[in-house]
Amino acid sequence: MDKSTVYFTDFRCPVGTSQLDKLKKLCIAAGIKDIDMDGKFVAIKMHFGELGNMAFLRPNYAKVVADLCKEQGGMPFLTDCNTLYPGSRKNALEHLNCANLNGFNTITTGCQIIIGDGLRGTDEVEVPVVNGEYCKTARIGHAIMDADIFISLSHFKGHESTGFGGALKNIGMGCGSRAGKMQQHASGKPAINEELCRGCHRCAKECGSDAITYVNKKAVIDYDKCKGCGRCIGACSFDAVYNPNDSANELLDRKMAEYAQAVCHGRPHFHIALVQDISPNCDCHGENDAPILPDIGMFASFDPVALDQACADACLKATPIENSQLGEHLAEPG
């Protein structure tokens, strides 16, 4: 198998050149203009950010990609699917309001926004997963599968369950309908180590399903309500919330990869990732901690796996920021 090519540019900008200029040149160098877009619908998948989060990609970047598509005769639209857990993006109306409040609209992005799985997150297509081992079919947002061409625009950052969130997570989890997200998260649900639990209530505040209560100042999970999203794991500062299934995160990763394959298979696709504002957790949180690594640059490729690998390799070579979650953990003895 031939090696895939990943293109890169850093964020350094001499006078007269902007990051937006560099993103456009990167996409062109990586081959976006080799895709025949004339008269075709182009889905640009990105994350609009949860309300309160400030680490998500700016709408200006989306406009660069949308404008490139329009220059080639394409009809682009930005898209994402509704969330499994309650929040500001659990249905299409609130999702669109969230996108607007975070700066995404027709003026700032140059195109329309369509929520991929409809009003309630039930407008889905069951797509076969070619040679799927963990998922025989994937439940994908209908509007996303209706598009002729698929482009992912991803913010590369940390993630409490998958280690990092990049192109594969943006595509696989992000394009899943609410039922599709449930299928991927079904690998395992968290548990509480009572000896480590401080009764601080952070996990309960983070839980969007009201699945965590307290008995004798210790957290208790209602598994009938728990969705298995893992947000409570990232919220706990004392390692009291954990996944008892040692393979749960690996299964989640594998299911996401199969979902990503279902989204991309059989049509032209192109992928972009910006490694900046590298927060330790997902942009699905209603807050973001300080970046754990310095801004690195922008990547583009026709191969989302190679893209994620290149981003991860670049992050592993970077020096952690001292006054950050990662820097503090590395400084701790043992």
Q: Residue ranges of each PLM-predicted region?
A:
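Extended, low-polarity segments enriched in aliphatic/aromatic residues
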Residues: D2-Y61, E71-D80, Y85-G334
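Terminal amphipathic helices with adjacent charged low-complexity linkers/tails
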Residues: A66-D67
